[in-house]
Each structure stands twice: as structure tokens, then as C-alpha cells.
Amino acid sequence: GVTTWWTTYVGRVMGQGLGGASTCLLVATGGAIVSYIPVGQMASKIGRKKTIQGGVVLLAACFASAYFLTTHYQSINAVMFVVFALVGLAWAAINVNSLPMVVEMCKGSDIGKFTGYYYTFSMAAQVVTPILAGTLLKHISYSMLFPYAAFFVACSFVTMCFVRHGDCKVEAK
């Protein structure tokens, strides 16, 4: 939802153009790229589940911060770039470890089936949430984008608390 609606949000809520909005998304992507390998290494030390949960907490905090920043400032600023870089880090912590957890839960012959489940539900969420978020933004307020995102990210933390399988064996210290 955030990626889909961000450029419209910046125009409606902040009165800004596409340049700053696009730069924020570029910074988030850069933050993710530089984080992929380190979060994979971190997961081998503390576990995938804890790494994902840390990413989820950071992402929710970033979305809450983005709400505050975008509703209290009329222009994109350096603090927003830092927040978006952290969004990239958080997203990397979640993404790098999610599919490996699914694969760890199944037997070798079931990897394709479980990968199919993973991508089906992941892609379905990516189709549904922009529609749901768009309806909310249209009928309530565009300023609801980040509270909406933070809420559903927090819900994902709750679901991760119930995950019992698929974690890696943590390296000995």
C-alpha cells in the first residue's frame, strides 16, 4: 500500500511533487540493498524469527515516524530520508528470511508446493492491500496511509509470534 500510494500521498498531504517522493523510495531501495547480506548474517547469529520480528518492529516504528513527519512538515527533509533508509533495512530483514523459513518447514519433495503457497499469499496481499488502502484513503483521508500500514505491520508481528518452525539453528558464540 505505501509504495503504491506514496507519490499521491506526498502530493495530497504535503503538497509536494514527484521528485522528493521518488527519492524517498529510491533511498528505501538503497537501504534494502545494503542490508540484504548483513541481515542474512544476523539471522544466522540470532535466528530468522527474531530477525523478522526486529524488522517488523522497525518497520512499524518507521511508518509511525513517517506519519508524524509527513503531517507536521510541508517538505521532504533529511530525517525522512533516514526513516526511508530504515524502512529498507526493515524490509530486508523481513524479506531475506521469510522464504527460507517456509522452505525449512517442508521436506525436499514439498519445496515447490510450499514455495507456491508462499508466493500465492504474498502476491495476493500485494494485490489486495493497495485496493483496501485506496478505499480507506479515498473515503476517510490520505493521512491514514501510514497508520494503516503501521497497523497491518503490527498484525504481522502478532502472527510471527505463533511461528514455531522454519528457524535456522543459531550459530554458537
Predicted regions, residues:
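Cytoplasmic membrane-interface "Motif A"-like loop-to-helix N-cap segments
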Residues: 45-57
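Helix-to-loop junctions at the C-terminal end of transmembrane segments
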Residues: 35-48, 137
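Intracellular juxtamembrane helix-capping segments at the cytosolic ends
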Residues: 93-107
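C-terminal ends and interior cores of transmembrane alpha-helices
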Residues: 58-74
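Multi-pass alpha-helical transporter architecture, strongest
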Residues: 147-173
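Short amphipathic helix-loop junctions that connect adjacent transmembrane helices
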Residues: 4-21
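Loop-to-transmembrane helix entry/capping segments in MFS-fold secondary transporters
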Residues: 18-19, 106-118
